Amino acid sequence: MPFALGQRWISDTESELGLGTVVQVEGRMVTVLFPATGENRMFSRAEAPLTRVIYNPGDSVESHEGWSLAVSELTEKDGIVIYHGIHSETGEQVTLRETLLNHNIRFNKPQDRLFAGQIDRLDRFGVRYQCQMLRHKLASSDLLGLQGPRVGLIPHQMWIAHEVGRRYAPRVLLADEVGLGKTIEAGLIIHQQLLTGRAERILIIVPDTLRHQWLVEMLRRFNLRFSVFDEDRCVEAYADHDNPFYTEQLVICSLELLRKKKRLDQALDADWDLLVVDEAHHLEWTEEAPSRAYQVVEALSEVIPGVLLLTATPDQLGHESHFARLRLLDPDRFYDYDAFLAEEDSYKDVAIAAEALAGNTKLPDAAINSLTELLGEKDISPSIRLIQADGIDAEVQQAARSELLQELLDRHGTGRVLYRNSRASVKGFPKRFFNAYPHAMPDQYQTAARVSGMMGGHKSLEAKAAQALSPEKLYQEFEDNSASWWKFDPRVDWLIEFLKSHRSKKVLIIASQAETALSLEEALRTREGIQATVFHEGMSIIERDKAGAYFAQEEGGAQALICSEIGSEGRNFQFASHLVLFDLPLNPDLLEQRIGRLDRIGQKNDIQIHLPYLEDTAQERLMQWYHQGLNAFELTCPSGHVLYSEFAEDLLNVLAVDDSDELTNLLNHTQSRYKELKHAMEQGRDKLLEINSHGGEKAMAIVQRLAQNDGDTHLIGSVIRLWDIIGVDQEDKGENSIILRPSEHMMFPTYPGLPEDGVTVTFDRDTALSRDDIALITQEHPLVQTGLDLITGSETGTTSVAILKNKALPAGTLFLELIYMADASAPKSSQLYRYLPPTPIRVLLDKNGNDLSAKVDYASFDKQLSAVNRHIGGKLVTASQPILHPLFAKGEEYAQVVVDEMVAQAREKMTQQLSAERSRLESLKAVNPNIREEELEYLRNQMQELNTYLDASQLQLDAIRMVLVSHV
C-alpha cells in the first residue's frame, strides 16, 4: 500500500476509532494516529487492515474547525489529497487538505461506508433486509398487540381486545363471568395500547391480595414489567422524584395506598394514560354516601383519559351498583339512576329483536315491527325480505341478519362501554364432577378440639369456624409446630392411596396454608416416595416457575403439585384434570378460584374434584352448604358472593356449633335464595349484549388469522438467523423449546431482555401455555423486537459486496442492489404506521441504470450469490467507483417514485378510513349517546396531524449490495 505522512485512513477492524492520520512510515511498518481517541496503531504496510478515505465530487466534507466544504474537484500533491469547493459559511471558493479533515467523522451513510471500505458480511445484509421486512409486516398488521401475549386464542377474549384496544382512550366495563378471562382481556388491551403507542403510562389498582398475581400475569403472559408500589416504595422513590409515581411508567398498587390523601394527590398529578381497576364491584356507592374507595377511583377516572373496570357480572350485585360503575366511565352519559332504569326498560324491545335475528327461523311480526321502529331512519325492507323469503341462499340470509344485528348494536344499549360474556353464551367449558370421601375424626384432633373449647371462650365466630375447618393447625398449637399431624390424619392416608392408584395422572392439590402444603409434600415423599412439588407465597416468582415447570413435564415431572391458597393465585394448570381440595376455604369466591385453576377455556377433559373430609365436623357442614346450597362444586356460582354476604353469620354459627336443625334451616334458605338469584340473572340476560361481547364469526376470523401467524415457518427461520448473526447461543432442549444464552462473541455488548444465565423459549403456543418457565416467541416478543432494533438501529449489514457466478452473463457485469426506507418521523401515538409502515423499497440496477427488481426477486437473486472477503470487496468497490456514483442518483429517482406513490396511497387510505369512522360515529351519536365527543375530536385532530407527517416523509438509503459477475 502507498502510504504518505498526513494521509487519512480508517481501521477496518476498529471503525469506532474514527479517522486516522499516518504519522510515521518506516521500513515495512506504518503508524497511524487516531486523534478522536488519542490512540496509535502500528501495522505491517503489506497487510494493514486499513482503508484509504477519499471523498468524491458532490460529497460534503467537514474540516477540523467545524465548517463544511461542498467538494467540486480534488487534486493530489505528495500523496496528499486536496479538496476544492465552496465554503459552507462564507460561500467562497476554498481548498482543504485531507490532513485537516475532522477526525470525528463517522461513516454512517451506507454509500460513505461502502466507499470507505467498511464492507459487511453478505449474510448480515440479508438479515438486515429480513429485519426491515419483519418490521413492516408487524407495523402494518391490524392485529398488532394480539399475537405476542402467552394466552390461548380464545375468540371472545380476542374480539374484546381487538375492539377495545384499538380505540383512543377506551373507557369500558369488562364484566365477564368468572373463568372467562377478564384479566387476560385487560392484559390484551393494555398490551395493544402500549405496542400501538396509544398509551405509555398505565396505573393498575387491585386489592392487596392480588398485587402479586397481577405482577406475575403481566410479566409471564404479556412481557410487561410493572412495578408494585406500596408505602415503602413511595418513600424510597423520593430520592429520584418528588412524585414517586413518576419514577415508573407501569405501576400496580392497592386501593388502600390511594386512600391516603397525599398518595392520591400524587397519583392524580402523574399524567397516566390508562387506569385499570380490578374487582371494581367492591366499590360501594349510593347517591347520598359514596364510599371512600369509590371516591378515589372517581377522582382518578376524571383526570385519566382511558379507564378499564373489571367487575363481577352486572346483575350479581344489583342494578344500582352497576349504574355506579357506568357512571365512573361516563358521568355525563350516566347522570341519573332513574333515567338509567327507564332507558334499560326500553332495551327489552331491542333484546327481543336481537334474539330473533340471532336465530335461524323467520322473524315474527313483533320482531319486524320492533326493528322497523328501532331503525326508523334506515330502509330495512330489502333485508327483511331476504330473511323472510324461501329458497334464498343461506349465506345471503345470514349476511342480511348480521347487517341488521350490527345496526342494532351500533345504535342501542351499552354495547360500546360494557362487555359481558357468560358461560351460557361461550362454549368450550368442561363438565365438573364432585367426589367426596368421608373419614372419621382422629382422637388426637378430638382432644385438641376439647382443650381449645375449654380455653377459647372469647374467640370470634369466624376464628372458631376457621379453627374447626383446620384441625391440623389446632393440633399443632397444642403440641408444637413440628408435630407430625400427617402421620395419623386419615385424609393423608387417602391422598397417598389416591395418588398411587392414579400414577399416570397429574393431580393439583390445594390447601389453605403454606405450612399444610409443605407438610403434605413431606408426607408424600417420606412415606411413599411420590414425586410432588410445592407452590406457596413464600417462594419467589422464579421458584414458582420452576415448580410449575416440574409439574408440567410429561417425562420425569412431578405427579402432584401442592399449592397454598395465596400461592396458587393467577396460575392455571389446564393440562391437569384432577383437583384435590385438602380443605375448604370459607369464601365461595375462593372455592371458585381454586376450581378455576383447572376449569378454564382450553381444558380438554372433564374435571374431577376430590374432597377428603372429616365426618361430623365443620368440614362436612361447609361441604354441604357449598354442594347442596350453592351447587358450587359442579357449577360456577355467580351469586356466591351475594349469598355469602347474606348468610355469613348463620353459616359461621353452624360451623362453630354442631346444630343439625340450624344446618337444615340454613340449607333450605340458601337453596331458595340461590334459585331466586339464578332466575333473576337468567331473566336479566341481554342477548344483544352477549352477541356484541363474544363477536361471533368476526371473532373466529381473528383467531384463525392469529393461528395462521403462529404457524409461520418463515418467521421462525428469520428469527433464528437474526440470533445467529447477533451471536446468541441456541441449544435445542427438546419439547419444542430452545435455550438462548449470550455468547462470548456477541455482536453487541448487551442484548436487553436476554439474561446472563439464559432463557428457555418456544415458537409453539401450546408448549408455552403448559409451561410457565418457557417464553412464547412471536414477532411481538421483546427479544425479537430488541433484536430487530439492534440490527436496524446499527450499521450492521448496510454494505456488502458479492460475486454472482453465472456464465450466461459477461464476466465483470455489475449490479447494484439498493434498499431504501420511507422515513416519516412521527410519534408512535400518531398511528402513522397504520397507513405508512416502515417499508423496504428494493431497487436492483444494472450498469446502465435499468431497474430489474420487478423481474428478479430478492430470494432467487440472493441464493445465487457468494461472499467475498472484505479486502477484495474494498478493491472491487474502488475499481467500480466511476460506475457506482451515477447509479446511486438513478436508484434514488426510482425509489422516490415508489415513495411518492406510497405516500399518496397512505393519505387516501387514512382519509377514507378516518372520515368514514368519523361520519359513522357522528351519525350514531344522534341515536346512541354512548359515542363520546372525545373520540370524535381525537379523529379530527388525528387526520390533521397525519397529513402533516405525510408531507414531511423522506427517502432514506438503508443498505447497499454491489454484485459482480465472475466465471471463476
Swiss-Prot record:
A motif (DEAH box) lies at residues 278-281. Residues 491-655 form the Helicase C-terminal domain. Residues 163-332 form the Helicase ATP-binding domain. Transmembrane segments: none annotated. SMART domains: DEXDc (SM00487), HELICc (SM00490). It is an enzyme of class 3 (hydrolase). GO terms for biological process: regulation of DNA-templated transcription. Pfam families: Helicase_C (PF00271), RapA_C (PF12137), SNF2-rel_dom (PF00176), Tudor_1_RapA (PF18339), Tudor_RapA (PF18337). Keywords: Activator, ATP-binding, DNA-binding, Helicase, Hydrolase, Nucleotide-binding, Transcription, Transcription regulation. It comes from the Bacteria. The keyword Transcription applies. ATP binds at D176, E177, V178, G179, L180, G181, K182, T183. InterPro entries: Helicase_ATP-bd, Helicase_C-like, Helicase_RapA, P-loop_NTPase, RapA_C, SNF2-like_sf, SNF2/RAD54-like_C, SNF2_N. GO terms for molecular function: ATP binding; DNA binding; helicase activity; hydrolase activity, acting on acid anhydrides. The keyword Lyase does not apply. Its EC number is 3.6.4.-. PROSITE patterns: HELICASE_ATP_BIND_1, HELICASE_CTER. HAMAP family: Helicase_RapA. Transcription regulator that activates transcription by stimulating RNA polymerase (RNAP) recycling in case of stress conditions such as supercoiled DNA or high salt concentrations. Probably acts by releasing the RNAP, when it is trapped or immobilized on tightly supercoiled DNA. Does not activate transcription on linear DNA. Probably not involved in DNA repair. Interacts with the RNAP. Has a higher affinity for the core RNAP than for the holoenzyme. Its ATPase activity is stimulated by binding to RNAP. This is RNA polymerase-associated protein RapA. It comes from Shewanella baltica (strain OS155 / ATCC BAA-1091). The gene is rapA.
